[in-house]
Amino acid sequence: MDTSRKIIHIDMDAFYASVEQRDHPEFRGKPLIIGGDPNKRGVVSTCSYEARKYGVHSAMPTRQAAKLCPNGIFIHGNMAHYVEVSSQIREIFSRYTDVIEPLSLDEAYLDVTENKKGMKSATMVARDIQQTIYRELGLTASAGVSFNKFIAKIASDFKKPAGITVVAPEEAEAFLEQIPVTKFYGVGKVTAEKLHRLGIETGADLKKWSEWDLIRELHKHGYQLYRHVRGRSNNIVNPHRDRKSVGKETTFEFNVLDNRILEQSLMKFAKKVEERLIKLQKHGKTVVLKLRYSDFTTITKRLTLNEYTNDANQIYQAAALLLRESYKGQDSIRLIGLTVTNLKPVYFENLRLEGL
């Protein structure tokens, strides 16, 4: 395991909301929710820390957010402006290193093992980046510093907002033992429920399990979690990373025959995919449906649209059509997935935040 790399994960604090509060003094100190009209369909894209005190969080339906935070200020936001500010942040990163792997508009990995400032301490680099962003742009960022990307990303969320957390190689396992497993990469709702049933709540609980037992219970996720909790993970920051597809899938706790449940899953996936595509500034043209039957037979069906889209409803309609054509209730479904491929960048003037 290579522990010589110096990797920083920078995560802007409540990015969209913070930009709006910076630009609009009337929003400062108030619960601001980026998500449009709470009386219409939509989900929260992000919200200010004032709104989070009421329990509002990203991906929550805006109607629910309005109930939790009746005094909240709801706005649609301005994606083109967020893209512009994101490019300003990226320019600041480039003053320190060219080895930058963007994850979305508001977060990125930086390898500063060899940096342009000649700083030997990655902690100093991270702090300098935070101060520069605040001084020049009036925004705060949190940073995680470690020897691999997995730990750096977890660490950046540890002391939000405007915090910095450093995890040295010799501290990694002890640090990970205290972390809830829901914070581990790849642990979604289904995996989290399985871990909970197994009595695994923290990294320390996870570490008690053998590699074989985790693989038996969780398959490939078990192998990944076994490595992650021991600090073994990818430490290569890839500046040429380019997503070829965006998707979501789930394995049902019990095999499913009901088309309504399958369609509900596709709608949830479509909303998640829409959110991710907008963050990546991309839209796609091909929708792919994946079905795995109870006998583990797997099929994929695809539909290429007439135009590029990042709209959840259009994505769902295409996936639902594929489902109706492919599945006649002949056997129960173990897994369902939805992916959008054939991606390309969205021009700034066409970026949409409608319903988010």
From Swiss-Prot:
Cofactor binding summary note: Binds 2 magnesium ions per subunit.
Domain UmuC: 7-188
The enzyme's E.C. designation: 2.7.7.7
InterPro entries linked to this entry: DNA/RNA_pol_sf, DNA_pol_Y-fam_lit_finger_sf, DNA_pol_Y-fam_little_finger, DNA_polymerase-Y, DNApol_IV, PolY_HhH_motif, Rev_trsase/Diguanyl_cyclase, UmuC
Residue numbers annotated as active site: E107
Class in the EC hierarchy, top level: transferase
Binding site for Mg(2+): D11, D106
Catalytic activity, as annotated: DNA(n) + a 2'-deoxyribonucleoside 5'-triphosphate = DNA(n+1) + diphosphate
Nucleotide-binding as UniProt keyword: no
Gene Ontology biological process terms, A to Z: DNA-templated DNA replication; error-prone translesion synthesis; SOS response
Molecular-function GO terms, alphabetical: damaged DNA binding; DNA-directed DNA polymerase activity; magnesium ion binding
Feature type site, description Substrate discrimination: Y16
Pfam families listed in its UniProt record: IMS, IMS_C, IMS_HHH
CDD domains associated with the record: PolY_Pol_IV_kappa
Main location: cytoplasm
Source organism superkingdom: Bacteria
A GO-annotated cellular component: cytosol
Subunit annotation: Monomer.
Function according to Swiss-Prot or TrEMBL: Poorly processive, error-prone DNA polymerase involved in untargeted mutagenesis. Copies undamaged DNA at stalled replication forks, which arise in vivo from mismatched or misaligned primer ends. These misaligned primers can be extended by PolIV. Exhibits no 3'-5' exonuclease (proofreading) activity. May be involved in translesional synthesis, in conjunction with the beta clamp from PolIII.
Similarity remark: Belongs to the DNA polymerase type-Y family.
Protein name: DNA polymerase IV
Taxonomic source organism: Listeria monocytogenes serotype 4a (strain HCC23)
